[in-house]
A protein has these predicted regions:
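Catalytic domains of riboflavin
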Residues: 1-137
Length: 137
């Protein structure tokens, strides 16, 4: 990566929504150690075109934070073709997809990079996941 580090790229296919999600992994993941995780819902208008200045280069900034931590995961969830804000049930579905991906990668403990001070993420226990700490982003 031009940002730094050797990243492993893994693609996950959501068969129900017919979407592909990407995980960028730096370093090794251990179930016994908290893993720095950034969940990012891709929006081409906000992320790539810079239409919302606060989101510009958010992926690059997340990668930099993970590099500083020496290992971690950046989970990029595809939004598909939708540019309309999702309702509450869709957001819960996205949490579930993200949790499934983390579980498949062997993550158990999370050090969450989040824009929200106290993100309300429910249902993680069902996937064997727990958020140990949250860091502002």
């Amino acid at each position: 990566s031009s940002i730094g580090g050797k990243w492993k790229v893994t693609k996950f296919k959501d068969e129900i929504e017919n979407l592909e999600h990407i995980v960028l992994q730096l370093g090794n993941i251990s179930p016994s150690t908290p893993v720095m995780v950034r969940m990012h819902k891709l929006n081409i208008y906000k992320d790539l075109l810079g239409l919302v200045p606060t989101r510009y280069n958010e992926i690059g900034r997340a990668m930099q934070r993970i590099i500083e931590h020496k290992n971690g995961l950046l989970v990029i969830l595809s939004a598909g073709n939708s540019s309309i804000e999702k309702d509450h049930s869709d957001k819960l579905k996205e949490y579930g997809i993200g949790a499934q991906i983390l579980s498949l990668l062997g993550v158990k403990r999370i050090k969450l990079l989040s824009n929200s001070k106290l993100p309300k993420v429910i249902g993680l226990e069902g996937y064997g996941l727990q958020i140990d700490t949250t860091e502002g982003f």
